[in-house]
A protein has these predicted regions:
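Functionally important transmembrane alpha-helices
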Residues: 166-220
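Juxtamembrane helix-loop-helix connectors linking adjacent transmembrane helices
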Residues: 35-38, 62-129, 137-141, 215
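Residue-level signature of the transmembrane alpha-helical core
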Residues: 78, 117, 121, 125, ...
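Membrane-interface helix/loop boundary segments of multi-pass membrane proteins
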Residues: 126-152, 179-186
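Active-site His/Glu-centered metal-binding helix of metallohydrolases
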Residues: 125-130, 134-135, 163, 196, ...
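N-terminal, membrane-interfacial amphipathic/helix-forming hydrophobic leader that caps
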Residues: 1-70, 82, 86, 199-247
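Membrane-interface starts of transmembrane alpha-helices
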Residues: 33-50, 111-118, 145-153, 186-189, ...
C-alpha cells in the first residue's frame, strides 16, 4: 500500500505544482499587461483548473476511467447529489460553521457565467480526475483494501479544501464518489455527482433564501426541514440500493 500511496501523493503534488506554475505565469502576464481587474481571481482559478485537467490527460493514463458507465447509474447520480445537498443545507441552518473563504467564493459567484463554467463544470472535472482518477486510481491498482483506499483519497480531498464548511461536504461527497468509482471504474458517476452539486450551489448563490421562506414561522420551517430530511434519507437509501443491484 505504501508504494501506491506514494505514487498517488506524488501525482497529486506534481499536478498541483504544475498548475501553480501556470497560474504564476498567467499572473505575471496579467501584471505586465495591466490586466488586473475584479475578474482576475476568477480567471486565475479557471487557468489553475484547466492546467490540472490538461496535465492529468497528458501525464496519467486515466482515459480508461472515462469509459462509459451504466445509464441507470448515471441517472441516479444527480438524485444522490441533490439529496445530500438538501440534507447539508438543512443541517447548516441549525449548525453554524464559519467559512474562511466566503469572500473568495462570493467574488466568483458575482459573475454568473464564470461561476457556472469554473465552479460548476471545470472544477468538478479537474477534482475528480485528480482525486479519484489519480490518487484513488493509484491506490486501487495495488492490494489496498477498497474502503481504506476510498478513505485515504477522501481525507486528502477534504483537507485540500482548507475550510471546515467545505471539508464536511467534501468528505461526504468524496466517500460516495469514491465508492461509485470503485464499483464502475469510471469517472463519469463521480463527475456527474460533483457537477450537479456545484451547479446547484451556483444557482443557489443567485437565489435569495429569504424570498423562499418569507412569511414562514420557525415551527413551519422546522416541519418542512424534518420532512425534507426524511424524504432525502429514504431517496438516498433506495437509490444506493438500486445502484448496488445494477452493477
Amino acid at each position: 500500500m505504501k508504494k501506491e500511496l506514494l505514487a498517488g501523493t506524488k501525482g497529486l503534488v506534481t499536478t498541483l505544482m504544475v498548475a501553480m506554475v501556470v497560474v504564476c505565469i498567467f499572473q505575471l502576464f496579467s501584471a505586465i499587461g495591466n490586466f488586473a481587474n475584479r475578474n482576475n481571481y476568477v480567471l486565475s482559478h479557471s487557468v489553475f483548473v484547466i492546467a490540472i485537467i490538461t496535465w492529468i490527460l497528458y501525464r496519467y493514463s486515466i482515459k480508461n476511467y472515462l469509459k462509459k458507465c451504466p445509464i441507470k447509474i448515471a441517472l441516479y447520480c444527480p438524485i444522490i447529489a441533490i439529496s445530500i445537498l438538501v440534507l447539508l443545507s438543512v443541517f447548516g441552518t441549525y449548525i453554524y460553521i464559519p467559512n474562511l473563504f466566503e469572500n473568495a467564493v462570493t467574488s466568483i459567484a458575482q459573475n454568473a457565467l464564470l461561476c457556472t463554467i469554473t465552479l460548476g463544470l471545470l472544477q468538478p472535472i479537474a477534482e475528480e480526475m485528480l482525486f479519484r482518477g489519480v490518487v484513488l486510481g493509484c491506490l486501487l491498482k495495488g492490494k489496498t483494501n477498497p474502503w481504506i483506499a476510498i478513505g485515504i483519497s477522501t481525507f486528502i480531498f477534504s483537507i485540500i479544501h482548507l475550510n471546515l464548511t467545505q471539508m464536511i461536504s467534501a468528505a461526504i461527497f468524496g466517500m460516495i464518489a469514491g465508492w461509485l468509482f470503485y464499483k464502475t471504474r469510471s469517472l463519469w458517476p463521480s463527475i456527474i455527482i460533483h457537477t450537479t452539486n456545484n451547479l446547484s450551489c451556483c444557482v443557489w448563490s443567485f437565489t435569495s433564501l429569504s424570498t423562499i421562506t418569507y412569511g414562514m414561522t420557525k415551527e413551519q420551517l422546522l416541519i418542512i426541514h424534518i420532512l425534507l430530511v426524511i424524504i432525502c434519507i429514504v431517496v438516498l437509501s433506495l437509490t444506493i440500493k438500486r445502484i448496488t443491484s445494477v452493477h
